[in-house]
């Protein structure tokens, strides 16, 4: 249990940030999921549109330290390469 007033405030701040970050992480995962579902269904046009929405979501999450920037870039790259495979 926090003893000092500053520690209590820090605890409140952490709780608020955690809630915000959870929301952002969920939103990011949802956008990635739509891309993966489109890829799984074999619909290239839908996958391209979904990736156009997912890429900014991933990069925003990376800017806000929800995921590492390299992890976000890697995810975008792998999704894009999977979409490229659909065209062949």
From Swiss-Prot:
Protein name listed in UniProt: Small ribosomal subunit protein bS20
Lineage: Bacteria, Pseudomonadati, Pseudomonadota, Alphaproteobacteria, Hyphomicrobiales
A single GO BP: translation
Region (Disordered): 1-33
Alphabetically ordered keywords of this record: Ribonucleoprotein, Ribosomal protein, RNA-binding, rRNA-binding
Coiled-coil annotated spans: none
Name of the gene this protein is made from: rpsT
GO MF annotation, one: small ribosomal subunit rRNA binding
PANTHER family given in the database record: 30S RIBOSOMAL PROTEIN S20 (PTHR33398), SMALL RIBOSOMAL SUBUNIT PROTEIN BS20C (PTHR33398:SF1)
């Amino acid at each position: 249990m926090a003893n000092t007033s500053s520690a209590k405030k820090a605890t409140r701040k952490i709780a608020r940030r955690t809630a915000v970050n959870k929301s952002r992480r969920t939103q990011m995962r949802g956008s990635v999921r739509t891309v993966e579902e489109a890829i799984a269904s074999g619909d290239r046009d839908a996958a391209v549109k979904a990736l156009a929405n997912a890429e900014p979501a991933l990069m925003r999450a990376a800017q806000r330290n929800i995921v590492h920037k390299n992890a976000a870039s890697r995810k975008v790259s792998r999704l894009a390469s999977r979409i490229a495979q659909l065209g062949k």
